[in-house]
């Protein structure tokens, strides 16, 4: 009896280990400026897409967050507020963490000592086939209303 239960557990573990290894998740985060849409005083120093938070990927959470914040004279995001976070509040929490890590640089020397109010949207998308799939899904998602 013990041998048959042990054998069944071993077969189950071996058959499912291949499935777990083959499951890939590709994440993408798209950043869209809402306000202002042009004539920026500050721009992100590193314009790469933010990394998809691993906790969100593990949970399969996708959605969007609209964030409002100030960029200080020193180029740091301050007064960060979650305007909308769909479908879960956790997207706003992770979006705040992303914003706090960004460094901002003035678009011109005359703008260096001026603060700026910004509103942006972050779209979090995942796919199981490729990075391109998740990027395409995110481009489509940015066309939808967040909330």
Predicted regions and their residues:
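Sec-dependent signal peptide recognition
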Residues: 2-8
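Charge-biased low-complexity segments
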Residues: 19-147
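N-terminal signal peptide c-region/cleavage motif recognized by signal peptidases
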Residues: 15-17
């Amino acid at each position: 009896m013990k041998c048959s239960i042990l054998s069944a557990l071993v077969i189950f573990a071996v058959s499912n280990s291949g499935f777990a290894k083959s499951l890939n998740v590709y994440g993408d985060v798209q950043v869209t400026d809402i306000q202002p849409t042009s004539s920026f005083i500050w721009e992100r120093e590193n314009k790469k897409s933010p990394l998809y938070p691993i906790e969100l990927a593990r949970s399969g959470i996708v959605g969007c967050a609209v964030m409002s914040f100030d960029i200080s004279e020193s180029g740091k995001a301050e007064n960060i507020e979650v305007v909308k976070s769909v479908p879960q509040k956790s997207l706003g929490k992770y979006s705040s963490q992303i914003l706090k890590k960004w460094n901002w640089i003035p678009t011109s020397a005359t703008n260096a000592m001026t603060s700026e109010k910004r509103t942006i949207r972050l779209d979090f998308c995942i796919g199981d086939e490729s990075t391109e799939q998740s990027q395409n899904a995110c481009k489509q998602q940015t066309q939808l209303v967040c909330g």
